[in-house]
Regions:
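C-terminal edge-of-domain segments
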Residues: 79-80, 94-132
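Short beta-strand segments
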Residues: 16-50
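Short, structured beta-strand-loop surface elements
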Residues: 51-106
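Short, basic/aromatic recognition patches
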Residues: 1-19
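Structural motif
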Residues: 42-44, 66, 88, 114
Length: 132
């Protein structure tokens, strides 16, 4: 059983870009837009892109092990929707280049521990979060 609702899964499958938040060993926050895919088999998000192997986001994820990722849009005025996923970051050193064209071999797999959504199964202005 997925940690995401069926409507959330459909939303994740329809999107390709989100924002990854990490924290450095010194405690400095870092947020960067990057591509992702939802891996339905593992029920995780996989985040990657070009130059991932040398990126701050990969170093932060490897060092801290905790990340957050937000996917959102607003297809109509005043109708925002999105999902925030917080969880454990697994740095995977091979296979990213087989997931998506333009990705480096290295990528970050996010294993969800908390999901918050708005405008998908809920009112767009009343996010609902849950530990998973």
């Amino acid at each position: 059983m997925s940690v995401f609702t069926p409507a959330e899964v459909e939303y994740l499958k329809s999107q390709r870009l989100g924002r990854l938040a990490t924290v450095s060993a010194a405690g400095d926050p870092h947020v960067v837009p990057c591509r992702f895919r939802y891996n339905e088999e593992l029920d995780v998000l996989e985040v990657g892109g070009g130059n991932m192997g040398k990126s701050k986001k990969l170093r932060d994820a490897a060092g801290n092990g905790r990340v957050a990722y937000v996917i959102d849009d607003s297809p109509e005025p005043r109708k925002p929707r999105g999902i925030e996923v917080r969880g454990r970051a697994e740095v995977v050193l091979t296979g990213g280049d087989e997931i998506m064209k333009g990705w480096d071999p290295e990528f970050i797999r996010i294993v969800p521990s908390h999901v918050a959504a708005w405008g998908i199964d809920t009112d767009p202005f009343k996010p609902k979060g849950r530990s998973v």
